[in-house]
Amino acid sequence: IPGKSLSELNKLLDDASESIEMTLANNQILFKLKDLLFYSRLLEGSYPDTSRLIPTDTKSELVINSKAFLQAIDRASLLARENRNNVIKLMTLENGQVEVSSNSPEVGNVSENVFSQSFTGEEIKISFNGKYMMDALRAFEGDDIQISFSGTMRPFVLRPKDAANPNEILQLITPVRTY
């Protein structure tokens, strides 16, 4: 189902408490509520096998307050967007802090340190698309997130720290080569 369709449906269902009936037909889906019929086309093609994308080994793990992290990335993205690639750099520091930075040749550099709750494993120097990271962070409820790294050029996984089932919701971010 296209993301835009799900977003619109979510807005319509914001306060709905009754059950929803779903019907699939050909390349369309129909959501039926008491006073609403919502049609959407389905995306064509086969969905990629994501189980191979999600890393199973972890070399480093970071626990950080999602709101503080999101705000730091948002501020760094203001400058990164000037360069059109929106690349944010993350580097772990020895004192339990994480440095979030970006630069734009025309404008300058920005760097901000954010305290982490914990960090274990190898030092991290990684770059990523700021918009993707902010979208991932906004999807979580709760205060803290756990980020698992399996290498500097391997995808990394974000999960809510205190989730009953840690695999219930996860976000996968692929790094950008800059270091």
Question: Residue ranges of each PLM-predicted region?
Answer:
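Bateman (tandem CBS) regulatory domains
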Residues: 53-57
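DNA polymerase processivity clamps
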Residues: 1-43, 58-179
